[in-house]
Structures are given as structure tokens and as C-alpha cells.
Amino acid sequence: MKKVLLISFVILSVAAQMTHAQKQAVIKLTEKTLMHEMRATPYPLDKAVVNDRAVSFQWPLRSDMNSQDSPLDGFEHKVKKVDKTKVTYRLRYSQDAGLKSGVVQVETRWPFYNPEQPLTPGVWYWQFGYVEDGQVTWGSTQQVTVEDRPGKFCPPSLKTVLAKLPADHPRVWIMKNEWKDFINHSKQKAERQWYLERADQVLQTPMKSVKDINVSQVKNLKNEMQINSYLTRESRRIIDAEEGNTEALIRAWLLTQDTKYADEAIKRVFIMADWDKDKNVKGDFNASSLLSLCSMAYDSFYDRLNTSQKKALLEAIKNKGGEMYENFNNRMENHIADNHVWQMTLRILTMASFSVYGDLPEANTWVDYCYNVWLARFPGLNKDGGWHNGDSYFTVNTRTLVEVPYYYSKLTGYDFFSDPWYQGNIMYTIFQQPPFSKSAGNGSSHQNVGRPNSIRIGYLDALARLTGNTYAADFVRRTL
């Protein structure tokens, strides 16, 4: 009888504990959304502890600028206009809770700030403020505890980066002082021949033009949304193909210094430079593709261009880059995930900015923005390494995820791949789709991904080489 009572008591106790645990596990959602589309809270949050990276201060936009609307392709002109040249913020921080002594105060044109030197370990207090008509409206005081630990990610300031930027050209896809060694070293690589074969095919291929854009269905469409969507798709067919062809010629020139590739690429770039002025060319991808070609031509062929050609390219870069920066400025940095930006357009503006820095005054601002917004927000918009935007589109981002930190690492000597996000992202990339497996299912079109594609494998191969991660290397070995 005692044994029965004891067993009954144990069962009741366990049941009670399970019920209590289940009650504790219930999370009630009270917000309208799981996350804010535009930043609604300062970062770091009050009482936060930061120990994995240098602190980046970030805060919400002014209420009159805090639009959640990211312009659709072809509808950029519909976005509410604010004179962003007059937008400024103040930030102050100190280890004094009253912000009376040892205060660092800065003014910034964007709602984020990366201190030039990492904050020393300890408790810090900070405030942001909106500046309007010379008056500052301060937010509440936030507290953040900074801890130190081995391997903490503390990239250099922009001042350090620019001090190491070469004055000559090329300096983006290849550094001029390394060019000859690069050519000689590339002769041992199989990939070199792939690029040259593609470029040789391009030399034999007549260019298409904007007149080849298929507009046959426009007459059957009912509204501006349908027309712009259709023209965006059809114009991309032409521009994507011609961008790929011309980029192949530029790469072949950098691999060989053979003038036949340079001359043909220069001719094609100047034909395409004004294509974005055509009424049938729509969308930010098309605009960024043309900016990429103009800036890569300027940097790669600098010593072959005459004065008027350089001037024309700088003017094109100024106009295209200016429009792109205007779209980013005081919007993108607070948007949770503007996919086109992460996939392509920020990378292109970054490379364009560094290609003309020192030659185009506007590039001073672009370089500042691109570099510091990368430190503040990138590479993954989170800390765990997962690509929460959706796995099917993950591989569209791989050029940005590799090329931008690689370029910064090359310039500075600091390893941008030491960002702890990359080690987490390697695990995500592997476990989201193991060798010879379908995607685990996250985001649109994941059901169409039947096995790891070449881009996913190539991305892990690049990270294995750049970080020494043996899991990534093993994944590549097993899937090839």
C-alpha cells in the first residue's frame, strides 16, 4: 500500500511540475508583429551586455521619416521626399551615469555611430538626440556593459581604412602594385581559362541594345504597377546579359592585360552608360548594374582612358551613385532587411565609392556611409548566423557576403571574416541543406531547391579557404 501511495505521489508531483513548466513555457504575444520592420528601439538596448564585438550605437529615425515603405522597382519616385541634407543627430556617451564628466559628444548625419576606438570594458551610459532648428531633443539615457574576451571583433575605423587605400588604379578587383604577380599566379589556376573562354565568346557576340527590350505586352496591361513590373523584368533580361558579357571582358583584361579585352569592354560600357535614361528601363537592379560597369571600367581601365572618357564616367557614376545613396540615406540603415540592398546594391555602391574616392567629391560621403553601415548592421542582420530572410534567396547574397569583407580585409589587413557571425553562418548553410538533401524549408521557393546548388557549395568553399573552417571544407568535399 505504501509503495502504491509513494508511486501515486511521485506521479502527481511530476504532473504538477510538468504543468508548472508548461505554464512557464507559454509566451503570450502582445505586439502586432514579431519584429519591427523599421527600428523602433535603440541599440544596444538598455542594460545590454556586449562582449562579442565593438559597440555600434543605433537609434530610430525621426517620426516624420520613419516610413516602412521600401520603394518597389519603378516606383522610387513615389517615396515621400525629405530634405535629408539637413537631417542631423547628436550622440553622447560616458562612463558617468549623469553624463557630466568624460563625455564624448558627436554629431552625425545618420541614425548610427561607430566609435573610432572600441569602448573600454565597463559600464557606459549614452543618449541620442534629434537636432531640429538648432535644438536637440534627447532620448532617455541607456546603459550598456562592455565586456572583453579573446577574439572580440573590433574592425578598424574608416580613418584607418582610407589611410591604406591606394591612390592609383586599379584598386578594387586588383591592386595595381600586385597586378603582375596576380597575372603570373593566375596562370596556375583552372579558373583563368574559364574566364578567358567566356571573354573570347563575348568578343564574337554582337551586343543587344535597349531597343531589344520586349514591350509587346505593355498594351495589354491595365495599370502602372503592371507596366513597371513587366518592364523591369524585360529590361533586366537585356541588361543582365550585357553586364555579364562586359564583366567577363573586364576580368579577362585584369587576368592578361590583353588590350583586345579592354578595348571591347570600354566600347560596350560607353554604349550602356546611358541605358537607364531609356523609358523602358526600370528597377534598382538595372541601375546598380550600370553603376557597377561604369565604376569597374573607371578603375580597371584608368590608365587607358583619356581625360574626356574619365570625365564622362565620373559624371555617370556621380548620377547613378547619387540616386542610390539618396535611396539608402536615413532609411536603409533602420530597415530590418531591404533584400535588394543586401543582395546587390550596397555591394555595388561600396565598390563604386572606393573606385572613385579622391576623384569624385561625393564619394567621400558614400564611402563613409557604406563602410560604417556595414560595421553597424552587416553581414547578417542578426547574431546567430542564420539567414532568416528565407533560404531560397540566401545564395543571391553570397557575392556581398564574400566580396565586401574580403575587400575590407585586403585593404586593412584586419580579418573581417573573424566576425563571429560567419562561423554561425557556416553551420546554418550546412544544416539548412546537408549534402544531397532538400532545403529544410524557410522562405519562398525553398521547395524547388532539391539539393545544394553550385552557389551554396562555392560559398562554403570560399569560407573554408578564408576562415579555415573544416566543416565547410568537408561539406564541399562530400557534395562535389
Q: At which residue positions do the language-model features occur?
A:
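Pro/Thr/Ser/Gly-rich low-complexity, intrinsically disordered linker/stalk tracts
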Residues: K23-H77, T145-E147
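Low-complexity, Pro/Ser/Thr- and charge-rich linker/hinge segments at domain boundaries
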Residues: V144-I174
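Extracellular fibronectin type III
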Residues: V131-R149
